[in-house]
Amino acid sequence: KRPDITLYVYGSNMPDDIKEFECDNIRMVGFAEHLDDVFHNHRVFVAPLLSGAGIKGKVLESMAYGLPTVLTDVAAEGTGLTHGISTLIAEKAEEWVDGIIKLYDDEKLWQKFAENQSTLVKSNFSFEGGKAAFKEIFASVGLFTTR
């Protein structure tokens, strides 16, 4: 649909048969030495995870960088992200394409997701957020300290 958009695929130990998908607008990069460069040089983070437990680290990293996401339900698990408010959830191929294009073209939506994701990760997954949560837990059982 959009030959002006290039999909970059990252991942360590990428199998050779996956690399065969590379074409004009798909780049099979594989392992990325510096993730900072990856998150700063792309407009949308895509995580088509179909299985896995727990919070996905790369999803949280993209949130911390304020990089809007298109995810599966599995990739969004445990992050607090909500479809249409802080991310786009996609399952079918057409939903992925539409979601990526929407975030490329709609600057207001891109900004909204970037801000909402950044706020979410700071309040729920930062050191300060964790410290505040533990302080509240300790206070609730009478172990409050002023330090």
What is each residue range found by the language model?
Residues 2-37:
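Nucleotide-activated donor-binding/catalytic signature segment of Leloir-type glycosyltransferases, i.e.
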Residues 16-18, 35-36, 53-55, 75-80:
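Short glycine/proline-enriched, acidic/aromatic patches that form the donor-sugar handling elements
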Residues 40-54, 65-68:
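Acidic donor-binding loop of glycosyltransferase active sites
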Residues 55, 72-73, 90-91:
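Conserved acidic donor-binding loop of glycosyltransferase catalytic domains
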Residues 58-62, 68-72:
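Short hydrophobic beta-strand element within catalytic cores of glycosyltransferases
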Residues 83-94, 102-107:
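Conserved acidic donor-binding segment of nucleotide-sugar-dependent glycosyltransferases
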Residues 105-140:
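A charged, aromatic-enriched C-terminal amphipathic alpha-helix characteristic of glycosyltransferases
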